Amino acid sequence: MRCCGVCAFDAARGPRRLMRVGLALILVGHVNLLVGAVLHGTVLRHVANPRGAVTPEYTTANVISVGSGLLSVSVGLVALLASRNLLRPRLHWALLTLALVNLLLSAACSMGLLLAVSLTVANGGRRLIADCHPGLMDPSIPLDQGPGHTDCSFDPTRIYDTALALWIPSLFMSAAEAALSGYCCVAALTLRGIGPCRKEGLQEQLQELTELELPECKRQENVQLLHGRQDFQALQKTWV
């Protein structure tokens, strides 16, 4: 039994939706990259310990998030190309492969960010600054007091607030990337006629739409050339 909400790609509105999803993936991917860069520059570079090891929050929130953002931009570009070239199987397979990988990566990123936020909230941010404040794992000691406080080059209370303020938007954007990538997977499978979302006669409908669009494009080009020629003749008369 087909699910109309999932298998929503059709010949009439599917290409336009795929184009919008591609643009959304490019936008969300760039914003996620920006948030990851700000998170690294303002928070996470302070909590790396001198031995080169980093907290689990760093790995989940920065590395995976940045990778998901980069891949989302790539999926968005391929989706834009596929929406304008609906009869090219190579683009369909490329879209399916990249979207499936990005779906898994974005889902893993969302789960990792959710775990990082949960751990950070549960211990009040002490896990983030454990290397700088080795004696502050005791919840009864305030973050701005205790042994090791004078060794830190940053304000530990702001690290907690800033990390959460950047992690939570990144969490929602990663979830959005996963959802948009899922739509791209469904669209690619529908275009190839694979799975429960295949539609009989879809390729023929797309072929007819493509053939109808070509004369329209040529007509618009002819109109533009005619208007340009008329403007040029009017300009010549003005100079004369």
From Swiss-Prot:
Coiled coil: none annotated. It holds the Pfam family BCLP. It is found in: Membrane. Its main location: membrane. One of its GO terms (cellular component) is membrane. It is a multi-pass membrane protein. Keywords: Membrane, Transmembrane, Transmembrane helix. InterPro entries: Beta-casein-like. The chain crosses the membrane at residues 21-41, 63-83, 95-115, 163-183. Belongs to the TMEM54 family. This is Keratinocyte-associated protein 3. It comes from Mus musculus. The gene is Krtcap3.
